[in-house]
Amino acid sequence: MNNIKDIWDAVLPPLPKPPLMTGTAQTMLSWPKVINSIDEIPDAFRTFFKTWLGDTQEFPHVILSPIKKGFFNTSSDKLICEMNDTIYVVEQFRDRIIANGYSPENIRDVEVGVVLLHGWITIKGINKEGVPAVSMFLFNSAQSEMFSSFITKIRSAPTKPDEAALNTERAKLDYLSQLDFKFMNYARSSLMGGEQVMHSVWQPEIHTTVGSVFGLSLTRTLSPAHLLLLTDKEMILIQDEPRSRGNKGVRYGGIRHYIPLRSVGAVSLAEQANDLIALSIHLSEDERVDSLFAASKEKEVLQLKTEIEKLIKE
């Protein structure tokens, strides 16, 4: 025996090594999961939930969104819950629990993004305390269907839509198949039962040339490909995520931004550099959603602006 380690190994048997966790198992730890009872609530939230639920007999619909490193940032453990017609997002901030509750009618807008396995939902509105609030949670998009009931609730969509009527409205978007098949599918699947398509404008990705190297032009993306879809109930903005990579000119995934018409205060149109025009959806005095279009789309965009103004005045 040449050293202390040899002596130690001879006296004591080696400790058993823990089983290695496969990459798949590690990935599954980041998946959201349905919580069925108070005993399944993570320790950090359990006392809060016991007090919060009180004598409630029926356990609410709760989903745990675990800590996840997202496409652009990292999210801590969060619980998403529906109770008494209210959507709650509960999270731990330092040593306290924060719960933002949103009634559907007080939600200003909601964004749903999916890029490969990275998914996120951002809710903006007035919480139950009457304070402006923003809640965001990340999730593995392989389990994105878990959150569909929350989006349905937020958008006040019927759980059992008239399929014949819905297919009639979806057919109005079939023209997109000749422009961008991915966006057609996104648009058709974004429609909810009971709403009517009023107008839509499609804009391919907009680039500008910033220089050249060895005779090859260098370009910069000014605006991702996007579609503005107006229904009689909401504005739906569907767009590529410009920071995502693509394959054969098609970027992976996309973002859907749902804005109920009650949240739209005004709409404006302005000329921009590079022969572009900007359509602005004003949600409040200091916040708006801007969409860039080529000047060649001006007639379509003007028609869209007129349709929006008519609907928000009704």
Model-derived features: where do they sit?
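Intrinsic disorder/low-complexity detector
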Residues: M1-T74, N84, V112-L227, D232-K233, ...
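Extended, Lys/Arg-enriched charged tracts that mediate electrostatic binding to polyanionic substrates
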Residues: V90, E105
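Long, mid-chain structured domain cores
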Residues: R94-A99, I107-L117
